Swiss-Prot record:
Cellular compartments annotated: Cytoplasm
Disulfide bonds: none
Organism: Vibrio vulnificus (strain CMCP6)
HAMAP family from the UniProt entry: RecF
Listed Gene3D superfamilies: P-loop containing nucleotide triphosphate hydrolases (3.40.50.300), RecF/RecN/SMC, N-terminal domain (1.20.1050.90)
Record key words, sorted: ATP-binding, Cytoplasm, DNA damage, DNA repair, DNA replication, DNA-binding, Nucleotide-binding, SOS response
Name recorded for this polypeptide: DNA replication and repair protein RecF
Similarity-based family: Belongs to the RecF family.
PANTHER family for the chain: DNA REPLICATION AND REPAIR PROTEIN RECF
NCBIfam families, A to Z: recf (TIGR00611)
GO cellular component terms, A-Z: cytoplasm
C-alpha cells in the first residue's frame, strides 16, 4: 500500500509538515542539510520504529522538544485509508498506533510498511560483517514466513540463557534441556532462510547481471554451522570450546550470505559505483520477490540518488524502479539529477531549512 499522506512533527530540523504524496515517485530536492534526508528518515522510523542514522532517540527529536511524531495514511486497493503513527519521547518511551488502536508492536509497523532503503552508507551490506547480510535475509523471511519473528526471538533468548549457563555448567548434561529446543528452532530458522535465498536468488542474480553485465555474480547461503551436521550434535561436540570462550560459537546467529563476483569477494573487485548498483539490485530483487509471494508492494527510500552513479547508471536504476510500479521516495540536490525518473504522475518537493513545499 502506498503512503497517501505524511505528517512529521519535531523531527530533526523539521518543525512540522503535512504533505500529500504520489503513489509513484516523490522527489525531495534541496541542498545538503536542508532536511530532505530527514523526510526519508522519518518514513523509515514509521516502518521500523527507529532511525537509520542514529540509534539514540534524543538525536532525532528536535532541540528543546520532548517528543517527535510521525503519522502516515495508506491507501489500499479498495481505496480504504489505514492510518498509522509513532510517537517517541526523549525518555525512550514509544507509542505505536495502527488503525487508531494504540499499544501496537513495532513488528506490526514493519508488516504494514515494508521498506527498502538505499543510501550512501548502504555499502555495509556487501563490505561489512555478516550481521548486515543476515538482516537482509531476515527482512525477506519476516515478510514471507509468519512464524519467523517469534521463532527467531525465542532462539535469541535461549542462546543468551545458554551463554550464561556456560559459565557455571559442570557438564554438558546441564545444558541438554536448553539445547534440545535451541536445536529445533535453529534448524527451523535455517531452513526458512535457505528456502528464501533459493527463491529470490535467480531474481537477484538476474538484476545484478543487468546492472553489472561485465561480472558474474554468485550468492551462497551459509547457515552458521557445518551443513551436514545436526545442530544439537554441534552444540554437544563444541561444549568445551564454547565454555572456554564463554559463548556459543556456532548457530543461526552466525549465518551469512556470501556474495562473490567472478569467484572473488565483491569488496575486492567492485568500485563504489558498482557496489551501489549491486546493493540496488539486491534490494529491488527483494521487493519484487515480496510482491510475487504476498501481493504487497515495497516502498523504496533512495537517499542521495546521484551519488557514485554516472548518468547511464542513473538511468538504468530509474528504469528498473519504474518497472516495479512501487512508491518511491528519492532525495537529490538538483532536479537535473532525477530527470530520468520524472513524469506527470510524480510529485516534487523543495526542501529548505526543514520546510517542505510542493514544487
Amino acid at each position: 500500500m502506498p503512503l497517501s499522506r505524511l505528517i512529521i512533527q519535531q523531527f530533526r530540523n523539521i518543525k512540522a509538515c503535512d504533505i500529500a504524496l504520489s503513489p509513484g515517485f516523490n522527489f525531495l530536492i534541496g541542498p545538503n542539510g536542508s532536511g530532505k534526508t530527514s523526510v526519508l528518515e522519518a518514513i523509515y522510523l514509521l516502518g521500523h520504529g527507529r532511525s537509520f542514522k542514529s540509534a539514540l532517540t534524543g538525536r532525532v527529536i528536535q532541540n528543546e522538544c520532548d517528543q517527535l511524531f510521525v503519522y502516515g495514511r495508506f491507501l489500499n486497493s479498495d481505496q480504504f485509508e489505514l492510518p498509522i503513527g509513532i510517537n517517541k519521547q526523549r525518555d525512550g518511551t514509544t507509542e505505536v498506533k495502527i488503525g487508531g488502536q494504540s499499544g501496537q508492536k513495532l513488528a506490526q509497523l514493519a508488516q504494514v510498511l515494508p521498506l527498502q532503503l538505499i543510501h550512501p552508507e548502504g555499502f555495509d551490506l556487501l563490505t561489512d560483517g555478516p550481521k548486515h547480510r543476515r538482516a537482509f535475509i531476515d527482512w525477506g523471511v519476516f515478510h514471507t514466513e509468519p512464524a519467523f519473528y517469534d521463532a527467531w526471538g525465542r532462539f535469541k533468548r535461549l542462546n543468551k540463557q545458554r551463554n550464561a549457563l556456560l559459565k557455571s555448567a559442570k557438564s554438558y548434561q546441564e545444558l541438554s534441556y536448553w539445547d534440545k529446543e535451541m536445536a529445533r528452532l535453529a534448524e527451523l530458522i535455517s531452513q526458512w532462510r535457505a528456502d528464501y535465498v533459493a527463491q529470490m536468488q535467480s531474481k537477484a542474480e538476474q538484476l545484478c547481471q543487468e546492472f553489472l553485465p561485465e561480472f558474474h555474480i554468485q550468492l551462497k547461503y551459509y547457515r552458521g554451522w557445518e551443513k551436514e551436521t545436526p545442530y544439537q550434535q554441534i552444540l554437544e561436540e563444541n561444549f568445551e570450546r564454547d565454555q572456554t570462550l564463554g559463548y556459543t560459537v556456532s548457530g543461526p546467529n552466525k549465518a551469512d550470505l556470501r556474495i562473490k563476483v567472478n569467484n572473488t569477494p565483491v569488496e575486492d573487485v567492485l568500485s563504489r559505483g558498482q557496489l551501489k548498483l549491486m546493493v540496488c539490485a539486491l534490494r529491488l530483487a527483494q521487493g519484487q520477490h515480496l510482491t510475487e509471494k504476498t501481493g504487497k508492494q515495497c516502498v523504496y527510500l533512495i537517499d542521495d540518488f546521484a551519488s557514485e552513479l554516472d548518468s547511464q547508471r542513473r538511468k538504468r536504476l530509474a528504469d528498473c524502479l519504474k518497472q516495479t510500479g512501487a512508491q518511491v521516495f528519492v532525495s537529490s540536490i538538483t532536479e537535473n539529477q532525477i530527470s530520468d525518473m520524472r513524469d506527470d504522475s510524480g510529485r516534487l518537493f523543495h526542501v529548505e531549512q526543514g520546510v517542505i513545499e510542493q514544487g
